[in-house]
């Protein structure tokens, strides 16, 4: 059994305060989930986050982690930014949604969404209705995503083998 219902992690820095927006929406919907949040090394607990913590008792917040695999494995579902963490969720077969912080992340988000591996919420700071729809679907267990073997965690080994082949010839 998973320890948390939802893990939220937005990388090293939440430049657009997306976490505050997500927590506000969770609060608006009066959603009862066991939450875990990884702030990232450069993200601080803002007054809005602290206020949410006082009202919501099923929440664990950590500043950072050295074991993302353990954190992702302990949850049923995730929300993350469109960077490296998307590959970690995919490798561990944990369904997730992507919120984009920067333009370059939209490509990854669209690709995961097209393959039905993740939900692409895009730039929620521009259209927060997407997070409302997503949270409703999550609470009603209406999110069905493919479990993919697309990412197996062995890419660096394959690359190093190819480099060694090139060096030997």
Question: Across the structure, where does each feature detected by a protein language model lie?
Answer:
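Nucleotide-activated sugar donor-binding and catalytic core shared by glycosyltransferases
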Residues: 1-169
């Amino acid at each position: 059994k998973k320890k948390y219902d939802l893990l939220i992690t937005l990388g090293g820095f939440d430049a657009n305060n997306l976490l505050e927006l997500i927590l506000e929406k969770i609060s608006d919907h009066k959603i009862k989930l066991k939450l875990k949040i990884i702030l990232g090394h450069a993200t601080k607990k803002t007054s809005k986050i602290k206020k949410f913590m006082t009202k919501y008792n099923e929440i664990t917040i950590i500043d950072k982690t050295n074991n993302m695999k353990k954190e992702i494995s302990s949850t049923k579902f995730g929300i993350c930014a469109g960077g490296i963490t998307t590959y970690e969720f995919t490798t561990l077969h944990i369904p997730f949604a992507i919120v984009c912080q920067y333009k370059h992340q939209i490509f990854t988000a669209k690709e995961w969404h097209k393959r039905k591996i993740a939900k692409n919420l895009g730039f929620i700071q521009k259209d927060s209705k997407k997070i409302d729809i997503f949270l409703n679907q999550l609470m009603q267990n209406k999110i069905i995503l493919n479990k993919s073997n697309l990412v197996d965690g062995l890419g660096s080994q394959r690359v190093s083998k190819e480099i060694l082949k090139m060096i030997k010839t």
